[in-house]
């Protein structure tokens, strides 16, 4: 059995790039590839997160477990996560600077009536070797040393202390993957297939202006707009990433990406007696992605790492198939050589991944 490679060349077009968000279009692809990219981003991107909390003192109103859970979900700068070892694969006996980062959270409220403890109060442990990473020691983000933040108002809240209360904890962060626990997930990612609209021009000519306006009003997402004026080009008025205008006797598609396939417009047309007036189908070769980073890794870097991880997985799959095929063919040849002539056997399936 031969597997012929598909003659498609996927490409990526970046639509919008911000500090913590990225919108891009995956072109000339299919659902399996789009879903693979999404799953890799959610579960296969390595990052750092607080895994162990040693409570030395806690007189706040929150239980130890509540505070530990909040600390575990704090995003930590993971741009250097690839330089760390997974703790269960490290050669050390317990933990070391190659697989963990140690922090201290020691805050007391003595002077004021209350004190809000935020992630800015977390400091590197003095016993941790800072010489390995220098100023790039992974810290909870946003980092107080590189950004202009007010620690009292802009930090991520952990717990509020009243006068006389205090907390003292030792924190240990380690490397992990999103498939192990949600605290290691680096981003939320989603995609949608681009909808394709088509109108029956013959039936559209039979509609009145009020009926066309009713079609536009039936959409809860304002995908359509009725202008009452037919354009000179009845097929396309313009094309961009988020606005696509398809004219049908004054009825235009102006926000196609807002379509949620609710079929309200189609149901309205059926009430008018024209069930085939509008057809909406997803384009299974064009996918609009949105990556919302937690801040631990920039979104463009997340996509880059995801593609590298996906490529490595495909290489491993090809290598394993080739190895299994060679092992199977080798054992068959050896058996024939030892036992002499045998009756014809069915040919071994051949899988070509090149």
Model regions and ranges:
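Protein-protein interaction/assembly regions in multi-subunit complexes
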Residues: 1-354
């Amino acid at each position: 059995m031969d597997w012929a490679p598909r003659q498609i060349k996927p490409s990526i077009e970046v639509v919008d790039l911000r500090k913590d968000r990225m919108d891009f279009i995956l072109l000339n692809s299919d659902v399996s590839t789009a879903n693979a990219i999404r799953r890799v981003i959610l579960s296969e991107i390595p990052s750092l997160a607080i895994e162990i909390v040693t409570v030395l003192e806690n007189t706040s109103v929150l239980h130890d477990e509540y505070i530990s859970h909040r600390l575990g979900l704090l995003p930590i700068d993971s741009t250097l996560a690839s330089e760390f070892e997974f703790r269960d694969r490290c050669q050390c006996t317990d933990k070391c600077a190659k697989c963990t980062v140690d922090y201290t959270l020691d805050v007391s409220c003595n002077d004021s009536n209350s004190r809000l403890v935020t992630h800015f109060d977390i400091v590197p442990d003095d016993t941790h070797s800072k010489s390995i990473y220098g100023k790039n020691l992974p810290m909870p983000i946003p980092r107080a040393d590189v950004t202009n933040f007010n620690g009292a108002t802009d930090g991520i809240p952990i717990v509020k202390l009243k006068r006389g209360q205090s907390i003292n904890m030792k924190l240990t962060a380690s490397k992990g993957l999103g498939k192990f626990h949600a605290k290691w997930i680096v981003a939320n990612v989603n995609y949608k297939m681009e909808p394709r609209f088509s109108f029956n021009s013959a039936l559209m000519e039979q509609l009145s202006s009020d009926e066309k306006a009713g079609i536009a009003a039936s959409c809860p997402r304002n995908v359509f707009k009725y202008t009452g004026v037919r354009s000179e080009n009845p097929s396309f008025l313009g094309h961009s990433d988020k606005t696509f205008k398809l004219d049908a006797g004054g009825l235009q598609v102006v926000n196609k990406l807002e379509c949620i396939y609710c079929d309200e417009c189609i149901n309205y047309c059926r009430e008018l007696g024209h069930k085939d007036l509008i057809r909406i189908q997803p384009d299974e070769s064009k996918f609009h992605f949105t990556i919302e980073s937690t801040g631990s890794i920039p979104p463009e870097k997340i996509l880059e790492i995801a593609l590298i991880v996906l490529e490595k997985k495909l290489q491993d799959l090809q290598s394993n198939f080739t190895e299994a095929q060679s092992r199977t063919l080798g054992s068959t040849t050896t058996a024939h050589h030892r036992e002499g002539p045998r009756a014809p056997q069915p040919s071994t399936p051949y899988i070509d991944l090149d």
